[in-house]
């Protein structure tokens, strides 16, 4: 069975995937399937066949790197009969929205089981991402070590990030429905102790999509 977890950051996807992997014996664990950084690490360790990737790039040289990676990973996901992957649409941020929708939809088309993860408390989700990316590169440990404030500009920037990608997920969900998993109701929170707490007065400029 090809299992796909479609989510945005800070929605409980790490614990959720870990629990699925404990209950199921997958032949292949893609992790974050379209994450360029982890993809390159797997290439360097030869977890992904370098020669296969090289040939694929040569055959698809008209595509940019992000599309090459997306098509290559979709091909591998399709060919695997028993695998699990996490899909974060923001890993395709260099592409336009139509292409992001295209590649996310292609993965959903070939998945046998799709879990759509979401978080009801969008404000906390935005705060979480704001802290993790406060130094540029994502760092989960900052949720426990960062003691500074968050400006409204940073929070508004992350709000726009989530608005873009949650709207994309909502569009894909309408054409490729799956099981909705909500962090607050369906996933045990094991990371609350010592976690950063926002004490400012920023609020969401508008409501963000909730899948039902």
In which residue ranges do the predicted regions lie?
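Residue-level preference for the first positions of well-ordered beta-strands
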Residues: 2-4, 81-84, 178-179
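PAPS-dependent sulfotransferase catalytic domain
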Residues: 87-180, 184-195
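Conserved alpha-helical scaffold flanking the Walker A/P-loop in AAA+ ATPase domains
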Residues: 75-76
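C-terminal accessory extensions appended to soluble enzyme cores
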Residues: 191-212
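A general structural motif
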Residues: 79-82, 110-112
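PAPS-dependent sulfotransferase catalytic core
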Residues: 1-72, 196, 202
């Amino acid at each position: 069975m090809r299992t796909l977890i479609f989510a945005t950051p800070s929605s409980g996807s790490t614990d959720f995937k870990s629990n699925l992997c404990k209950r199921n014996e997958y032949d292949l664990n893609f992790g974050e399937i379209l994450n360029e950084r982890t993809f390159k690490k797997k290439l360097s360790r030869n977890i992904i066949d370098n020669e296969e990737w090289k040939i694929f790039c040569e055959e698809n040289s008209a595509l940019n790197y992000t599309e090459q990676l997306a098509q290559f990973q979709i091909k591998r996901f399709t060919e695997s009969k028993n695998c699990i992957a996490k899909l974060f649409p923001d890993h395709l941020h260099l592409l336009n929205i139509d292409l992001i929708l295209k590649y996310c939809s292609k993965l959903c088309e070939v998945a046998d089981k799709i879990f759509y993860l979401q978080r009801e408390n969008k404000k906390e989700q935005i705060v979480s991402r704001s802290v993790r990316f406060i130094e540029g590169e994502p760092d989960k440990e900052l949720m426990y070590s960062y003691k500074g404030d968050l400006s409204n500009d940073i929070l508004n920037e992350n709000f726009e990030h989530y608005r873009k990608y949650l709207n994309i997920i909502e569009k894909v969900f309408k054409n490729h429905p799956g099981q909705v998993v909500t962090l607050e109701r369906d996933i045990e929170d094991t990371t609350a102790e010592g976690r950063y707490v926002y004490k400012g007065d920023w609020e969401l400029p508008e409501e963000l999509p909730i899948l039902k």
